[in-house]
Curated annotation (Swiss-Prot):
The gene is rpsT. The lineage of its organism: Bacteria, Pseudomonadati, Pseudomonadota, Alphaproteobacteria, Maricaulales. Belongs to the bacterial ribosomal protein bS20 family. Keywords: Ribonucleoprotein, Ribosomal protein, RNA-binding, rRNA-binding. GO terms for biological process: translation. It comes from Maricaulis maris (strain MCS10) (Caulobacter maris). This is Small ribosomal subunit protein bS20.
Length: 88
């Protein structure tokens, strides 16, 4: 348990930040699922538009510090490779 006032405040700040980051991570997962559903359904146009939205959301989360930049880049790269392979 936090003893000092500053430690108590840090506990409150961490709880707020955790909630915000959890929401951001959930939002990213939702956008990624939309891309994956479009890929499995075979709808290439929907997959491309969903990929653009998912990439934007992923990079926003990277900028906010929710994901490491390499993690974001890896996820975008793998998703775009899967969308690209639909046309081949």
């Amino acid at each position: 348990m936090a003893n000092t006032n500053s430690a108590k405040k840090m506990v409150r700040k961490i709880a707020r930040r955790t909630a915000v980051n959890k929401a951001r991570r959930s939002r990213v997962r939702t956008f990624v699922k939309k891309v994956e559903m479009a890929i499995t359904s075979g709808d290439q146009a929907a997959a491309k538009t969903a990929l653009v939205e998912a990439e934007s959301e992923l990079m926003r989360a990277v900028g906010k510090g929710v994901y490491h930049k390499n993690t974001g880049s890896r996820k975008v790269s793998r998703l775009s490779a899967r969308v690209k392979s639909m046309s081949a």
